[in-house]
Amino acid sequence: MTDLNVTQLGRVVDAPESPEAAVLERVPNPQSDVLYLARFVAPEFTSLCPVTGQPDFAHLVIDYAPGDWLIESKSLKLYLTSFRNHGSFHEDCTVKVARKIVEIAQPRWLRIGGYWYPRGGIPIDVFWQTGPAPEGLWVPDQGVAPYRGRG
């Protein structure tokens, strides 16, 4: 295997204390000449309410069309874990995750759906994307139904 210049893959690594301390890594995309979509799903994303300190939970769906770089998935897992003790509003967490991926991987296109579970009786869904999807890119539905209580 070639040297991928990563610091976490294949090693025992402690969970980062915060998103600022986390290291999100990239690896070369061997299919950089092909337009395709890659999807990461994090069904148990957690963060803290910045006011009450209570836990918040979300189902994140991250779709991106890689360019020259791929997001290394272990580093993404650790980056997402770093939010566990981080106080931030739902909207901020969702967009922060997406913008960090864009900064590191420089994809052709990215969108994120943050499907937050209710607190105070209100579910919050947050959506962000870098712009229109490239022509010819197959973009499937994110597959997360709107929240429905017992009603």
UniProtKB/Swiss-Prot annotation:
The active site is at C49 (thioimide intermediate), D56 (proton donor). Its EC number is 1.7.1.13. The keyword Oxidoreductase applies. One of its GO terms (cellular component) is cytoplasm. Substrate binds at I71, E72, S73, H90, E91. It holds the Pfam family QueF. GO terms for molecular function: preQ1 synthase activity. It is found in: Cytoplasm. SUPFAM superfamilies: Tetrahydrobiopterin biosynthesis enzymes-like. PANTHER family: NADPH-DEPENDENT 7-CYANO-7-DEAZAGUANINE REDUCTASE. This is NADPH-dependent 7-cyano-7-deazaguanine reductase. It comes from Caulobacter vibrioides (strain NA1000 / CB15N). The gene is queF.
